[in-house]
Curated annotation (Swiss-Prot):
MF-aspect GO terms: amino acid binding; ornithine carbamoyltransferase activity
One Pfam family, short name: OTCace
Name by which UniProt lists this protein: Ornithine carbamoyltransferase
EC annotation from Swiss-Prot or TrEMBL: 2.1.3.3
Gene assigned in the entry: argF
Lineage start: Bacteria, Bacillati, Cyanobacteriota, Cyanophyceae, Acaryochloridales
Keyword Cytoplasm found: yes
Gene Ontology CC annotations of this record: cytoplasm
Length: 310
């Protein structure tokens, strides 16, 4: 069966980028997450997951922990400040020790290079739980939410408005991988990285739109989903005051939402700053799917862990 074949290809793998997945593998994970969400599939995975987080986390930490518990496994929280990593032990040494204790590790760190270095030395699955470059688990949840809302991903357009950050990068890659039209509207100086855009265009194979714009209204026109994130990510708090006037025209509000498809949904990876990147009326409005989107982190990560570890 195709599903079983795809699970076999995922077993023991790393997920450092959404582009590490084939289209069939990504679709399989969404299907499995949807089945797990309604209780149709409940694999047991009595393994141990380590969480090595150098950045604050609510949804990612809790959803990974609950997912592992629901699979019958256990979680160890590895705060860098309470391990030898915080005292300067080389990451390569830590990786080679932890892979003898753990069955997988999810890492939230600043640099993608640190994540890659750990994965190079660890023999267990390494999962990107967020870096400054990408946030692949978030995007799996986003795509599941989009598919739930419309019944399909075919022919849909997702419009991301705001900072061309890690979420924008993974949205570009994930949407291109699954054939969803993706538009990103950012101030020119905060556009997504050029190499990510080029990679997304290559993944799309010219079969779906991959567009980077500076005009949020043009980007939002006719879109099936409007998506935003904070204007200053973790580690950029000192820049928030300078960024605010630059990003103000990129706020998702009722006016911008009116330009989208009448059935459009609103997404935000959270935490949200109400009346900054998104107005409270839109965040709490009838087209918002933000809370469903947050819930879906649990289901896609449970599907991912089961596929990598069972």
């Amino acid at each position: 069966m195709v599903g079983r074949f795809v699970m076999e290809t995922l077993r023991g793998r790393d997920l450092l980028s959404i582009a590490d997945l084939s289209r069939a593998e990504a679709e399989y994970l969404l299907d499995l997450a949807a089945q797990m969400k309604i209780g149709k599939v409940a694999p047991q995975c009595p393994k141990v997951l380590g969480l090595l987080f150098q950045k604050a986390s609510t949804r990612t930490r809790v959803s990974f922990t609950v997912a592992m518990y629901q699979l019958g496994g256990q979680v160890i929280d590895l705060n860098p400040q309470s391990t030898q990593v915080g005292r300067g032990e080389p990451l390569t040494d830590t990786a080679r020790v932890l892979d003898r204790y753990l069955d997988a590790v999810a890492i939230r760190t600043y640099g993608q290079a640190e994540l890659q270095l750990f994965a190079d030395y660890a023999r267990i699955p390494v999962i990107n739980a967020l870096t400054d470059r990408e946030h692949p688990c978030q995007i799996l949840a986003d795509l599941l939410t989009l598919r739930e809302s419309f019944g399909t991903l075919a022919g849909l357009t997702l419009c991301y408005i705001g900072d061309g950050n890690n979420v924008a990068h993974s949205l570009l890659l994930g949407c291109a991988l699954l054939g969803v039209n993706i538009r990103v509207a950012s101030p020119p100086q905060f556009a997504p990285l050029a190499d990510i855009v080029a990679q997304a265009k290559a993944l799309s194979g010219g079969k779906s739109e991959v567009a980077v714009l500076t005009d949020p209204q043009a980007a939002a026109k006719g879109a099936h989903a409007l998506y935003t994130d904070v204007w200053a990510s973790m580690g950029q708090e000192a820049e928030a005051g300078d960024r605010q006037p630059i990003f103000q025209p990129y706020q998702i509000n009722d006016h911008l939402l009116a330009l989208a498809d009448p059935r459009a949904i609103v997404l935000h990876c959270l935490p949200a700053h109400r009346d900054e990147e998104i107005t409270a009326s839109v965040l709490e409005g009838p087209q918002s799917r933000v809370w469903e989107q947050a819930e879906n982190r649990l289901h896609v990560q449970k599907a991912l862990l089961a596929s990598l570890l069972v």
